[in-house]
Amino acid sequence: ALPRAIGNPMYHWCHLELKNFFGYEGVLNGQTAQQVWDLALEKLAQPEFSARNLIRRSNVAMIGTTDDPCSDMHYHDLLAKSGFETKVCPSFRPDSALNIHKSGFAAYIRKLSEASGICIRGAADVAQALSARIAFFDTMGCRAADHGLDYVMYRQGTMEQIDRAFAKAMAGEDLCVEEVEMYQTYLLLHCAGEYARRGWVMQIHFSCMRNPNEKAFAKLGADSGFDCMAVTDSCQALYRVMNALEREDLLPKTILYSLNPADDQWIDTLLGAFQSSQIPGKIQHGSAWWFNDNKVGMQNQLTSLANLGILGNFVGMLTDSRSLLSYARHEYFRRILCNLMGTWVENGEYPADMETLGALVEDICANNAKRYFDL
């Protein structure tokens, strides 16, 4: 399939990984597949291809894992004691506690109650349990939280309404959209305030259509390759979420990712409405994500951010791949960034000042993220 994927980033990534890690500079196709397979087997048997050595070869300063609030952090504790030079920090992912409308919610709340030591009878108890787990994650070096939302919601409700929705969910009853949104808004604002108090970074991912193919979902389950972009009305709600937090001086450092590139420009104008003179680039437009994680998608995100914001304050690329070879995607990003900046210079839109340009590239690709995540 790979030779037919002309223009697809998978073609670029695969060849970058083969070159950077395995020293293979040929083309992967049906004729070379056995040669590449044999080379990979030979290399992977060598000590320098251990997981830690692959990370060392990529010069990784920090890895942020994705962790459920109920995690006991056992392996993080072992890693911290092992002396591994790359920081491996947990990231708080409380989606299961917020997804009141999804199956398995009641069982998850019982698990959260056990992990936190909080008897959970209502929504305020869920908030207290999450606060307890946030405090624990903080002791383990957590620097960021991540919220995966189908869309951004903002619907205020009374505690009586929110508790009624919670009770219905715990009893296995269906909830209306308004009930789901009131509960999720309450907990999103609560968690964001906790992040702000600790100097964490809040990441919000949205505009994803999950499991549209019911037949495939029934056969293979979630996260099996059938999700897609969504058109969502998240703009007004996100403004209101951020305004509610800013009003109370509880807006944390925030990175926003939309799966729909049509959202790029309004996101980039939103950044300017909530920036801070104390933290350069406090509110970030996250790097082109998932379906946009390709040459054109990256160029479009970078161009929109440059046109409407300050590209020099951007915290740059991340890879959320589970592959230890995926750090090659950072090189992919750097190539695209430098090509774009070089085009602007050649067009006379920026001086050919190599010292300034070099410093900008270093900041976008490394230094800004180090400062932003307090590394």
Language-model segments: which ranges?
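Divalent-cation-assisted or electrostatically stabilized phosphate/pyrophosphate-binding catalytic cores
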Residues: 232-238
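Short glycine/proline- and charge-enriched loop/turn segments
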Residues: 217-225
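Hard-cation-handling environments
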Residues: 208, 213
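Metal-cofactor-binding active-site regions of metalloenzymes
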Residues: 1-198, 249-252, 256-268, 272-375
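C-terminal amphipathic alpha-helical interaction region
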Residues: 202-204
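A short acidic, glycine-rich active-site loop
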Residues: 177, 226-232
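Short, basic/hydrophobic alpha-helical segments
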Residues: 241-247
